[in-house]
Design a protein with these regions (language model features):
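Hydrophobic anchor residue at the start of the ABC signature
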Residues: 160
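Catalytic Walker B motif of ABC-type/P-loop ATPase nucleotide-binding domains
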Residues: 171-174
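A short, proline-enriched helix->beta-strand linker immediately N-terminal to the Walker B motif
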Residues: 165-169
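Conserved ABC transporter NBD signature motif
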Residues: 35-42, 46, 94
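ABC ATPase NBD coupling module
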Residues: 44-59, 83, 119-128
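Conserved ABC ATPase signature
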Residues: 146-150, 154
Length: 190
């Protein structure tokens, strides 16, 4: 199967036929039993590949939403962007701290990484993006509530914008409307 940028692909089959397993393999949440998964030119099924680097470019919307019930809606949306960018910030700071020692043993000297942000700035940017996304789906008034207070359609819309908050190259949807009644299906698709 080849899926190019901008393509929309739907996998249809009876219950138990492997649709969810296929999606979980695409995101390397499960190991494929054979073949390759080429994403942005890299076989991400190769055990030597750091899948976390590639997962940053994949959004996943789960059948059962997979939201953290102990976090508010906005915290659920902000979680991944803040975590990923703070990890990058931490790596850059560690790189810069180790640079004098690293360069002692290398012929080709490494450069210092310019750090242009802070954790508080990362959090502020993630919050602004989350607020903008909530506004786009008409749920800005639900930012500070917990997922348990949302309807199924609202949870699914939040799950979708949570995936969008990472600016992914691709979004994988695992039965995005299966847990919804017909009225809520229309709400999510709108």
């Amino acid at each position: 199967v080849t899926i190019d940028k901008g393509d929309i692909m739907v996998v249809i089959g009876p219950s138990g036929s492997g649709k969810s397993t296929f999606l979980r393999c695409l995101n390397c949440m499960e190991d494929p039993t054979g073949g390759q998964i080429i994403f942005n030119g890299v076989d991400i099924a190769d055990p030597k590949v750091d899948i976390n680097i590639h997962r940053r470019h994949m959004g996943m919307v789960f059948q059962h939403f997979n939201m953290y019930n102990n976090k508010t809606v906005i915290q659920n949306i902000m979680l991944a962007p803040v975590l990923v960018r703070c990890q990058d910030l931490k790596k850059a700071k560690r790189h810069n701290r180790m640079l004098p020692l690293t360069n002692l043993f290398r012929k080709e000297k490494q450069e210092k990484i310019e750090i242009t942000t802070s954790k508080s700035q990362i959090v502020a940017e993630a919050r602004a993006k989350a607020e903008e996304l909530l506004k786009r789906i008409g749920l800005e008034d639900k930012a500070d509530v917990y997922p348990s207070t949302l309807s199924g359609g609202q949870k699914q819309r939040v799950a979708i914008i949570r995936a969008l908050a990472m600016n992914p190259d691709v979004i994988l949807f695992d039965e995005p409307t299966s847990a919804l009644d017909p009225e809520m299906v229309g709400e999510v698709l709108d």
